[in-house]
Every structure is written in structure tokens, then in C-alpha cells.
């Protein structure tokens, strides 16, 4: 059993048990899990199917989001110099992952294939909306690498 309270997802966050030294190990582990989930999702073993993609990505990204949300909440309401340092150290890593997730051309191609498949017409409304949002919010990597002409 993991003793890091940021890695315990069976109940509400145990805010009082969370210390600054828990942040980096938890976020690093959850980022590794989320990165691995992304690689699995875009690989050949996961069909271009909403449920298949969701099964691979949702758990990992939800766990990361839940842990990071807890850290962010504590940073807002019970900040200490140590927690602020842990938050500031991990913020770029979490941001970089979400940027990569939203700009991954391989994932975008899978989502486009899902949207183009006949099964997408049978998706429940919330899933159709989530799929439409994923396609709408995709940002090509080239947006981040081009220098603005000023």
C-alpha cells in the first residue's frame, strides 16, 4: 500500500496528511503513468474507438488531475513556503504534459478516426460532446514551435 496521500484515490483527499514532500514523488509517478497511457492510446493495440481510448486515457489523466487539483487547492488555501516551492517545481511538468496531450498529432488522428467512424453516431450525447471538444481543442505542435513575426 502506498503511504503517499496524494496517491490514495479511494476516498476524498486527506488534506491534513499531505505534506510538501509528498508532491514531487506523487506527481512524477502520475506523470509517468499518464505518459505511458498516452503512448498506449496512440499505439496500434488501441482501436480508434471512443470507449477504447477512454479506457486507456481517462484513469491516468483523472488521477493526475485529482492529485494536482489537491495540490493546487492546498497551495491556494493553506500555503507554506515548502508547499509553494513544491507547487512551483511541479507546475511546469504538469503544464508540459497537458500541452503535449492537447497537441499530440497521433492522438488527434485517433480522435478524428473515431469521429469519422459509423459508431460515433451511436455515442451518447455526453461522449459526443467530449469527442467534439477534444477535436475542437487540439492545438498543433507547430503553434508552439513557430516564432511570431513582430
Each predicted region: which residue ranges?
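Zn2+-dependent metallopeptidase catalytic domains
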Residues: 1-150
Amino acid at each position: 500500500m502506498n503511504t503517499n496521500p496524494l496517491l490514495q484515490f479511494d476516498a476524498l483527499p486527506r488534506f491534513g496528511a499531505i505534506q510538501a514532500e509528498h508532491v514531487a514523488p506523487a506527481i512524477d509517478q502520475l506523470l509517468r503513468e499518464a505518459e505511458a497511457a498516452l503512448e498506449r492510446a496512440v499505439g496500434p493495440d488501441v482501436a480508434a474507438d471512443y470507449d477504447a481510448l477512454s479506457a486507456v486515457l481517462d484513469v491516468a489523466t483523472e488521477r493526475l488531475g485529482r492529485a494536482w487539483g489537491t495540490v493546487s487547492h492546498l497551495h491556494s488555501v493553506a500555503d507554506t513556503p515548502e508547499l509553494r516551492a513544491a507547487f512551483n517545481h511541479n507546475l511546469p511538468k504538469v503544464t508540459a504534459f497537458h500541452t503535449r496531450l492537447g497537441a499530440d498529432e497521433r492522438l488527434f488522428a485517433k480522435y478524428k478516426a473515431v469521429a469519422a467512424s459509423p459508431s460515433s453516431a451511436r455515442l451518447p450525447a455526453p461522449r459526443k460532446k467530449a469527442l467534439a471538444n477534444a477535436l475542437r481543442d487540439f492545438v498543433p505542435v507547430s503553434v508552439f514551435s513557430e516564432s511570431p513575426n513582430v
